[in-house]
């Protein structure tokens, strides 16, 4: 299900030179021939170190029902990934922009391309962040079907034991030592 925000939201396309090359409506950018565009991923932790995993809503057009990192999104034109992270935390998880602390960039150069079972492609330059949330979350059911807080070591074990249950971008992100170490810290 699309929301009014997703109908008007723009994603920033990336040209062959690796620089911004225009925009495209988010509602129609993801197809079988998705252009390369900017995004971000974020892993949220609580002060006790537990990591939030979310299961994508079943109505999502790509990877419905798949478990993944805490949240993802697309910076809009002129928006920094950090500002987009705070915006999406509110839209997706009901976290006030001030409710996130210590947002830090873990994988600045992460990118991936993946095709879901319906043939829709994700092709993103997608820096990966971690941030701390101290308060409660109130996930938007149009975005998140289920969620679970887990110790970082349990997250890594679950992905290793059942990789098919998790999003391809999360699996690829966890191939990076810097992220694995951050989740275990």
Spans of model-derived segments:
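A short coil-to-beta-strand element that immediately follows conserved catalytic motifs
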Residues: 96-107
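Nudix hydrolase/Nudix homology domain
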Residues: 65, 77, 109-185
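Acidic, metal-coordinating catalytic segment for phosphate/diphosphate chemistry
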Residues: 2-41, 45-47
């Amino acid at each position: 299900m699309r929301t009014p925000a997703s109908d008007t939201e723009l994603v920033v396309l990336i040209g062959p030179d690796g620089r911004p090359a225009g925009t495209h409506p988010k509602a129609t950018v993801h197809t079988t021939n998705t252009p390369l565009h900017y995004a971000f991923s974020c892993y949220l932790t609580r002060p006790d170190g537990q990591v939030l995993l979310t299961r994508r809503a079943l109505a999502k057009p790509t990877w419905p029902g798949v478990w993944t990192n805490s949240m993802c999104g697309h910076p809009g034109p002129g928006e920094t990934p950090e500002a987009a992270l705070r915006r999406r935390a509110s839209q997706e998880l009901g976290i006030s922009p001030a409710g996130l602390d210590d947002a830090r960039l873990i994988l600045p150069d992460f990118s991936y391309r993946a095709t879901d079972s319906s043939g829709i492609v994700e092709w993103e330059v997608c820096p990966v962040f971690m941030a701390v949330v101290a308060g409660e979350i109130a996930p938007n059911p149009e975005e998140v079907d289920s969620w679970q807080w887990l110790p970082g070591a349990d997250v890594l074990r679950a992905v290793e034991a059942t990789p098919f249950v998790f999003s391809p971008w999360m699996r690829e992100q966890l191939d990076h030592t810097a992220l694995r170490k951050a989740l275990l810290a």
